[in-house]
From Swiss-Prot:
Organism encoding this protein: Persephonella marina (strain DSM 14350 / EX-H1)
A Gene Ontology biological process term: aromatic amino acid family biosynthetic process
Enzyme class: oxidoreductase
GO molecular function, one term: NAD binding
InterPro entries membership: DHQ_synth
UniProt keyword Ribosomal protein present: no
Entry protein name: 3-dehydroquinate synthase homolog
EC numbers on record: 1.4.1.-
Amino acid sequence: MKEFIVNAINYDKKIVTTAIESGADYIIIPEDKEEEAKKLGRVNFIIADKKGNLTDDFVIVTIKNKQDEEKAAQLAKAGKKVIVRTTDWTIIPLENLIAQSENIYAEVKNADEASIAVGILEKGVKGVVLETEDLNEIKRVASVIKETTEKVELIRAKVTAIIPVGMGDRVAVDTTSLFKRGEGMLVGNSSAGMILVHAETEESPYVASRPFRVNAGAVHMYTRVPGGKTVYLCELEAGKEVMAYDIDGNGRAVVVGRAKIERRPMLLIEAEYNGKKLSAVLQNAETIRVVGGDGSLISVVDLKEGDEILGYVEEAGRHFGMKVEETILEK
C-alpha cells in the first residue's frame, strides 16, 4: 500500500488529529511539539529540527534543475526516503526518479495531484506528502491513497470441471472492512491463474450475511496482497493486509481481523481461458459464491461446466510471493 504523510510542520492540533483519524502513516511535526502530539494518538511521527532535518531517514529535496534531480536519485539509491518538492509540479522529474529508485515520495497539494503521483509509470511513488490547512483535503487524499491501490484486468474463464475432493482445511478471512456487492478476493491453486471468490454479502435461508468475510478456500491457495505480491491463505492473520477486488478489477487493501481455519468438505473448480488453466479448491457450501462473466453471483453448488466466471491470469511465475520471469509449471 502507498504511504500517506501529512506535513504538520506548522503545528496545528486539528491537522494532526484529522491526519490520525484519516489513517496517515506518518505526520511531520516540529521537535518542540513531539510530546504534545504523541498524546493525540498512536502514529509514526517524523520529527523536524530547527534546521529542517527529518528523522527516520527522510530528506526533502527541492527540484529546480537536473543537478537537483541527480542529487535526489543518489540519496534514494543510498537508502534515504526522498520527499520530492518541485517549484513547478510536473510529472517528468518524478518519472525519472521512480525509474531509478523506489524510495521516492511526492509532495502534493491536493487529491488530484496525489492520484497522479501514485499512478506514474504504473507503479507510482512510494507515498505522498500533503501540506494543507484544509481538513477535508486530508480526508480526500487519504481516500485516494488508502482505497484504490491496484487495478487488474479480470478475464472471463469457462468452467471445465467441478470435482468434490473430500475434506480439507479452509480459511474464512474476516476483515475490518465491509465488502460491497461485487467484491471479493482472488484465490488460486496457482498464482498464475486465480478465481474471484465473492464476499458473504448476500442473505441466505441458512445463515445471516457476513459482509466483512470472504470464505476464501483451502489453506494452500495463493491470494493477492498489496504491492503485487501473493501469500498463502494460511499465512493470513490479524493485522495483515489482503487485496479485495470488484468485478471491474479495481483493488483495495483491507486489513485482516481474523482468519478462521476449519475442516470442511471441499470442491475443486477448474476453468480455462485462452488455453490457460485456472483452478481453486473452495468449500462445498451454498454460501460460497464465485462471480459470473456477467457480474452475477453463482453459488458453487449451482455452478456448471460451461459457465463463465471472472478470474485473473498472469504470465510470470512467483518466487517467495514476488513475480519473476521464469519457467514454472504448477499442476
